[in-house]
């Protein structure tokens, strides 16, 4: 019934199995990949005919996690998986980025890759396995895919690289790096690091590249057994058309790409394009060429002019050389009511970054496949259409915004203080107000400044820079701080963020078949020079975190109470803690280990809440003086609330120094009194005294009397 084929290898000390022919047989390509006990299914379907009216590769990649894979039922009312989580979106991008450059030029057929997590063993993260499975399914599908690719996760512990560390091992690693590529070159890198050197980062990339070679060989072996015949892609020869078009507009297009200002340059390019349209599509005549073909040739000419100009002259579009960073202006404290804010401008790229400090109530609850946890650091990136001078629809967050936000998050996360030292929930929002390349790295710089402006004690300021590449044969140029056009027309987007000590995040995307170790080494060294320069410019605005939190930020005090007292502080159905919150206005969070966090903008309210909680969580001491409130007056005395929720009896004989006929002659309900704890009777009832305390000063009269007696004793002995 089934025409099954499989390949199994040992990879990083665990078995990796790739199987096809049993599940999803109607897809063009389908592979079930198993690593340990983590299992994913990758499917590929490509449309039979090209999509009309498009000049790009219509590729869609969807990664989805099913909760049954971890033996769980989804939360919520409907009890089924909903819209993609952040993790699913990020892994979808992780798969897309290395496979997209490997499709044949001119492939315009709708192509969909779906990867589904079927089982998760809580040891092996499914993301790398999903990349491997997608690569295998594409290789089998018959789509014009010039793969396969391999992928690996690399950790760094005890000065050694670790291949595919488990989820438990990732807790202790100094590096989390995912690398993907072909047998010959690296195509994609995504990483977070604890301020590691360029050499260690490059070593990790090459370590991963070496160790995913067996995976590529396994996919090739499976393809030899089960792959479909590759589909043909028709590609017209446009060399003559390109030569003709260059003669028509070279005089306009070449000077256009020497204009430094983005909008003026775009206007000049648009004028050249209009000339092309007018020439090839004259009114009233049947056009000789398709509009998409003309547009593709025009784009190719743009790239050719920009690329060869850089290689031949060393000068870029805006007149800079390869290593120069655009002019930078960094400002902090730009928003009066925000807890922290910064405006970071680099050339025509600008980010308004705002920090807000919150309490435990503001933590984000993450329901991940590997388990639930609370996130205390959030970084959100917004890219409105006005930032590039366009109109557009505002709606749900796009994949690109999620990806750029996570990249900036990875850059900042390693330099944040530990949560037990700075117990705030931190939210950073980067609003891109202008964009001409490298907006995610502007977000990193702005986030660092904004956090320091808010008083968050970062280990060190952090900056980011985007590097580009022009590669023609054996000639290449690595570009620092790339423009948007250099990104679109170049071969690489290589983003590096870090401190003066080392790298905290690295992301690389290649649009060609891959780059060599030599080019990466040059790019990392050049990126360090640029990063140090940017840090120097940022230091003109702020060098360290402010000594005090922002005026409008909440203050948080942290202390511990015995775990057996948590129930008393919370009260039945939360009655006690609700009363504390209502009466003091403070926010209170109590952890299972007895850690209490009290937050408030009002110092007095915070003190009152802390005093109240401590009074409940601790026991009163015999002989100590307390201030209390009379809650009930009886014939035999008065009950006084004196220690949190604790009440005690002041017997009528202890109300005053002189004889008291009626308790109500001395006190009434609601009176504020000072009492001394005398002790506890046989039944555990609390005994208090008012007469032992000076009600005006709070002085212990019994102790004062004892001191006076001791002072009089020598005089009596002398017979005075």
From Swiss-Prot:
SUPFAM superfamilies: Eukaryotic type KH-domain (KH-domain type I), Nucleic acid-binding proteins, Polynucleotide phosphorylase/guanosine pentaphosphate synthase (PNPase/GPSI), domain 3, Ribonuclease PH domain 2-like, Ribosomal protein S5 domain 2-like
Reactions that this protein is recorded to catalyse: RNA(n+1) + phosphate = RNA(n) + a ribonucleoside 5'-diphosphate
Name of the protein described by the UniProt record: Polyribonucleotide nucleotidyltransferase
GO terms, molecular function: 3'-5'-RNA exonuclease activity; magnesium ion binding; polyribonucleotide nucleotidyltransferase activity; RNA binding
The encoding gene: pnp
Domain KH: 554-613
Record-level GO BP terms: mRNA catabolic process; RNA processing
Main location: cytoplasm
Annotated residues for binding of Mg(2+): 487, 493
Protein origin, superkingdom: Bacteria
Lineage: Bacteria, Pseudomonadati, Pseudomonadota, Alphaproteobacteria, Hyphomicrobiales
Family assignment from sequence similarity: Belongs to the polyribonucleotide nucleotidyltransferase family.
Location(s) in or outside the cell: Cytoplasm
EC class of the enzyme, as a word: transferase
Cofactors demanded by this protein: Mg(2+)
Record-annotated S1 motif domain positions: 623-691
Enzyme Commission (EC) number: 2.7.7.8
Listed Basic and acidic residues bias regions: 703-720
Gene Ontology cellular-component terms listed: cytosol
Region of interest: Disordered: 691-720
Keywords for the protein's UniProt record, in alphabetical order: Cytoplasm, Magnesium, Metal-binding, Nucleotidyltransferase, RNA-binding, Transferase
Organism in which the protein naturally occurs: Nitrobacter hamburgensis (strain DSM 10229 / NCIMB 13809 / X14)
Protein function: Involved in mRNA degradation. Catalyzes the phosphorolysis of single-stranded polyribonucleotides processively in the 3'- to 5'-direction.
């Amino acid at each position: 019934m089934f025409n099954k084929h499989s390949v199994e290898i040992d990879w990083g000390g665990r078995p990796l199995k790739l199987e096809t022919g049993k599940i999803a047989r109607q897809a063009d390509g389908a592979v079930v990949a198993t690593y340990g006990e983590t299992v994913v299914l990758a499917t590929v379907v490509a449309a039979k005919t090209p999509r009309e009216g498009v000049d790009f590769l219509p590729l869609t990649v969807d990664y989805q996690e099913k909760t049954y894979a971890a033996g769980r039922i989804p939360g919520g009312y409907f009890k089924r998986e909903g819209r993609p989580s952040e993790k699913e979106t990020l892994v979808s991008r992780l798969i897309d980025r290395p496979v997209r450059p490997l499709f044949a030029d001119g492939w315009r057929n709708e192509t969909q890759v779906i990867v589904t997590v079927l089982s998760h063993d809580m040891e092996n993260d499914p993301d790398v396995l999903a990349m491997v499975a997608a690569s295998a399914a594409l290789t089998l599908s018959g789509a014009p895919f010039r793969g396969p690719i391999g992928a690996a996760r690399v950790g760094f512990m005890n000065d050694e690289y670790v291949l595919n560390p488990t989820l438990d091992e990732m807790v202790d690693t100094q590096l989390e790096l995912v690398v993907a590529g072909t047998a010959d070159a690296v195509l994609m890198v995504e990483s977070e690091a604890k301020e590691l050197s360029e050499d260690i980062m490059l070593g990790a990339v090459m370590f991963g590249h070496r160790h995913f070679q067996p995976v590529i060989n396994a996919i090739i072996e499976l393809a030899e057994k089960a792959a479909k015949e590759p589909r043909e892609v028709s590609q017209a020869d446009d060399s003559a058309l390109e030569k003709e078009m260059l003669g028509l507009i070279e005089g306009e297009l070449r000077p256009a790409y020497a204009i430094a200002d983005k909008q003026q340059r775009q206007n000049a390019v648009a004028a050249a394009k209009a000339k092309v349209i007018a020439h090839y599509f004259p009114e009233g005549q049947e056009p000789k060429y398709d509009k998409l073909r003309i547009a593709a040739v025009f784009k190719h000419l743009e790239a050719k002019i920009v690329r060869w100009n850089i290689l031949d002259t060393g000068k870029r579009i805006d007149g800079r050389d390869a290593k120069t960073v655009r002019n930078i202006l960094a400002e902090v404290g730009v928003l009066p009511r925000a807890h922290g804010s910064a405006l970071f401008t680099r050339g025509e790229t600008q980010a308004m970054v705002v920090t807000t400090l919150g309490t435990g109530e503001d933590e984000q609850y993450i329901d991940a496949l590997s388990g639930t946890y609370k996130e205390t650091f959030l970084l959100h990136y917004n890219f409105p259409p006005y930032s590039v001078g366009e109109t557009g629809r505002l709606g749900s967050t796009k994949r690109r915004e999620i990806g750029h936000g996570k990249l900036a998050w990875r850059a900042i996360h390693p330099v944040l203080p530990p949560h037990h030292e700075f117990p705030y929930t931190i939210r950073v929002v980067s609003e891109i107000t202008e964009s001409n390349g490298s907006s995610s790295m502007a977000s990193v710089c702005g986030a660092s400044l904004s956090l320091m402006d808010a008083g968050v004690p970062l280990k060190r300021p952090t900056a980011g820079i985007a590097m580009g590449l022009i590669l023609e044969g054996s000639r290449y140029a690595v570009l620092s701080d790339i423009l948007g056009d250099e990104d679109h027309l170049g071969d690489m987007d290589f983003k590096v963020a870090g401190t003066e000590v080392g790298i905290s995040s690295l992301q690389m995307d290649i649009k060609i078949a891959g780059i060599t170790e030599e080019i990466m080494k040059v790019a990392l060294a050049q990126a360090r020079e640029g990063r140090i320069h940017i840090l120097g410019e940022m230091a003109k605005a702020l060098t360290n975190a402010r000594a005090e939190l922002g005026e409008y930020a909440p203050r948080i005090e942290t202390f511990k109470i015995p775990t057996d007292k948590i129930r008393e502080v919370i009260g039945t159905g939360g009655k006690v803690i609700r009363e504390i919150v209502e009466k003091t206005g403070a926010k209170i969070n109590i952890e299972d280990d007895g850690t209490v966090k009290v937050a408030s903008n009002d110092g007095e309210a915070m003190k009152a809440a802390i005093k109240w909680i401590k009074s409940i969580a601790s026991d009163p001491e015999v002989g100590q003086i307390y201030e209390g409130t009379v809650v009930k007056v009886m014939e035999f005395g008065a009950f006084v609330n004196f220690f949190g929720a604790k009440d005690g009896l002041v017997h009528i004989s202890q109300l005053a120094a002189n004889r008291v006929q009626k308790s109500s002659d001395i006190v009434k309900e609601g009176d504020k009194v000072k009492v001394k704890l005398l002790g506890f009777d046989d039944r555990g009832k609390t005994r208090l005294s008012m007469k032992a305390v000076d009600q005006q000063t709070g002085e212990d009269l019994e102790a004062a009397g004892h001191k006076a007696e001791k002072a009089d004793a020598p005089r009596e002995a002398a017979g005075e």
